[in-house]
Amino acid sequence: MAKIVVGLSGGVDSAVSAYLLKKAGHNVIAVFMRNWDSSLNNDFLGKKNEKNFTICPQEQDWLDAKVVAKQLNIPIFRIDFIKEYWDEVFSDLILKYQSGLTPNPDILCNKNIKFKHFLDYAQKVHNADFIAMGHYAKTDNGNLYAGADSLKDQSYFLGQLSKSQLQKTIFPLGNLLKSEVRKIANELGLINAKKKDSTGICFIGERKFTDFLQNYIPAQPGNIIDISTKKVLGKHIGIMYFTIGQRKGFGLSGMKEPYFVVGHNLKEKILYVSPQSEKKWLESDSLMAKNANFLSENFRNLDNLSAKFRYRQEAIPIRIEKIQDNSFWISYQKYQAITPGQQVVIYHQNQVILAGEIALLFRNGKKLDYLD
């Protein structure tokens, strides 16, 4: 049987993953990753409910992971990737917010930390044959597939992994529903069987987003302007706090209908908005993506392709129009609020074949200037 290092987070998914691998007869080793230090990383503003904790949530996760490892009778170790996370995930996050983009830190977190540095560590220190994570996804010979639980499927976040990374990775929960995972944990009496799922920024956790970003990017107030009438409707606290399609949180009151964010002018610090009745400002029918990751050699010959532009979105039909170097162009029926900086992940049935970072959007052949 194989030697497998499991990323044990303190949550129920990784705990059940470790159990299933051990039950199958594998030599299982648990490793807890610590990738964020609030003191070192100047993380003071934006913490949620910190008065309710007698211990910081990350340290509680470590304690839970140790108890689970003891319950499963497997060894556990702890490794820090704090510098790597800052250099290869968080710095990019801040840079993109400063540029008016809406990044997804989970994409880089998976690519550079969980399935790069963690994999290297597992192979070099523990001589592991494979690593395993509690993601709801499937792998087969370097191919990536959506998980059986459509509500929990995390293949979207894994679209930038290489085939070599996927060949060394096991997802024990790929064929299970979340309810089945909870049931297994309850039957085993695991300490975290009823623990709430983790949310928020990868390895950082829940934060009050606006306050949290002010730790790293000074607030730069400016005008909120109706993109059609050019009328100033109010003031915003900083462009980086708002994403395309957002309809709450920018302080407009007394309006006849809801308004949406439809664009940014970084130089003039203008936040462009539009009323709900003018949805054309949010609509696109094609896009260009960069940083392409090709996970299938035969995708050019495939029909019935679909794409997701955000997590938990239902995939929509698309057509690949052009591929050039590390970029690709796709077309689709008009769709709203696709956001520069996010990932587009393309599927053939339930297999991920291609992913990239959304760079440009178009409507009727004309480029949409979401960012000036």
Curated annotation (Swiss-Prot):
Stretches for region Interaction with target base in tRNA: 104-106
Q: Where in the cell is it found?
A: Cytoplasm
Where does the protein principally reside? cytoplasm
Q: Where is this region: Interaction with tRNA?
A: 152-154, 310-311
Q: List the disulfide bonds.
A: 109-202
Molecular function terms in GO for this entry? ATP binding; tRNA binding; tRNA-uridine 2-sulfurtransferase activity
Q: Which reaction does it catalyse?
A: S-sulfanyl-L-cysteinyl-[protein] + uridine(34) in tRNA + AH2 + ATP = 2-thiouridine(34) in tRNA + L-cysteinyl-[protein] + A + AMP + diphosphate + H(+)
Keyword presence, Translocase: no
Q: Which GO terms describe its cellular component?
A: cytoplasm
Assigned EC number: 2.8.1.13
InterPro entries from the entry? MnmA-like (IPR004506), MnmA-like_C (IPR046885), MnmA-like_central (IPR046884), MnmA-like_central_sf (IPR023382), Rossmann-like_a/b/a_fold (IPR014729)
Q: Which residues bind ATP?
A: 7-14, 33, 134
Q: Keywords on this record?
A: ATP-binding, Cytoplasm, Disulfide bond, Nucleotide-binding, RNA-binding, Transferase, tRNA processing, tRNA-binding
**What are the BP-aspect GO terms?**
tRNA wobble position uridine thiolation
Give the similarity note.
Answer: Belongs to the MnmA/TRMU family.
- Give a short account of what the protein does: Catalyzes the 2-thiolation of uridine at the wobble position (U34) of tRNA, leading to the formation of s(2)U34.
- UniProt xrefs under NCBIfam families: PRK00143.1 (NF001138), trmU (TIGR00420)
Q: Can you say what this protein is called? A: tRNA-specific 2-thiouridylase MnmA
Lineage runs: Bacteria, Bacillati, Mycoplasmatota, Mycoplasmoidales, Metamycoplasmataceae
